Amino acid sequence: MKTFTAKPETVKREWFVVDAAGQTLGRLATEIATRLRGKHKPEYTPHVDTGDYIVVINAEQVRVTGAKSSDKMYYSHSGFPGGIKEINFEKLIAKAPERVIETAVKGMLPKNPLGRDMYRKLKVYAGAAHPHTAQQPQELKI
């Protein structure tokens, strides 16, 4: 019996909406990354993007445990000497709450062109409203 390999043109993708309100950041991000990769499906194939689309709402209400809200740091670099910038979780969640979830999920995806395609299927919104109602996303309980 030959090993089954999913073909990109036969992959059936679904849309899911996840409410991040009150969820722990890491536990939420691992479940989202698993579904973006398609590892929850029986037809998962490592070299084919078999994942679903994920819409995350209420990103501003995601939480972290312990003292991470003041201790967890996010770094960025301008590319110029001395151009490193750092911001903690508290300030980033106030400034750009979408980036917190996007950064956590992106770090859990492959670092190659296939991983970038998977990352494009993630849509994160700070509030409860999102523009993807036409896709009729199903609610995903995490």
Curated annotation (Swiss-Prot):
Pfam families: Ribosomal_L13. GO terms for molecular function: mRNA binding; structural constituent of ribosome. Keywords: Ribonucleoprotein, Ribosomal protein. The keyword tRNA processing does not apply. GO terms for biological process: negative regulation of translation; translation. CDD domains: Ribosomal_L13. PROSITE patterns: RIBOSOMAL_L13 (PS00783). InterPro entries: Ribosomal_uL13, Ribosomal_uL13_bac-type, Ribosomal_uL13_CS, Ribosomal_uL13_sf. GO terms for cellular component: cytosolic large ribosomal subunit. Part of the 50S ribosomal subunit. Belongs to the universal ribosomal protein uL13 family. PANTHER family: LARGE RIBOSOMAL SUBUNIT PROTEIN UL13M (PTHR11545:SF2), RIBOSOMAL PROTEIN L13 (PTHR11545). This protein is one of the early assembly proteins of the 50S ribosomal subunit, although it is not seen to bind rRNA by itself. It is important during the early stages of 50S assembly. This is Large ribosomal subunit protein uL13. The gene is rplM.
